[in-house]
């Protein structure tokens, strides 16, 4: 969600997502930036199905909390470390599981 802050110069936009789940927060042309916060579907106990995107890669950046990416048809777990970029290549099956305090970009 775009937020209005006092003192922000012209030409700068500020966005945040404080709710649960996934939100395509900002987009331009063919690219977008989204936040992912905890939601039941992303909980470690959830068994929601993996997904894949045939046309684009998908990037995950852990900002806080704990998150695991499960990669490939064998769902190999990868523990995410804060402030690292994890790029899931187009066509690769994946799903993410997060702690209740997690915030990902």
Give the predicted meaning of each segment.
Residues 35-54:
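Conserved short histidine dyad/triad with adjacent acidic residue
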Residues 45-48, 88-92:
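Short acidic (Asp/Glu) patches
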Residues 73-90:
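Short acidic-glycine-tyrosine-enriched beta hairpin
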Residues 35, 71-73, 90, 98:
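Residue-level recognition of conserved beta-strand positions in structured domain cores
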Residues 81, 90-105:
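Ligand-binding loop in jelly-roll beta-barrel domains
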Residues 52-69:
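Short, conserved beta-strand element in jelly-roll/cupin
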Residues 30-33, 56-59, 101-103:
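Short, surface-exposed beta-edge/turn micro-motifs
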Residues 1-35, 42-43:
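A short, N-terminal "cap"/entry segment at the start of jelly-roll beta-barrel domains
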């Amino acid at each position: 969600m775009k937020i209005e802050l006092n003192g922000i110069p012209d030409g700068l936009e500020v966005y945040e997502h404080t709710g649960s789940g996934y939100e395509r927060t900002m987009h331009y042309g063919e690219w977008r930036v989204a936040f992912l916060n905890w939601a039941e579907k992303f909980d470690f106990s959830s068994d929601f199905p993996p997904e894949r995107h045939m046309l684009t890669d998908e990037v995950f950046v852990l900002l806080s909390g704990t998150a695991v990416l499960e990669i490939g048809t064998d769902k190999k777990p990868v523990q995410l470390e804060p402030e690292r970029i994890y790029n899931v290549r187009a066509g690769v099956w994946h799903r993410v599981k997060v702690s209740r305090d997690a915030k990902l970009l």
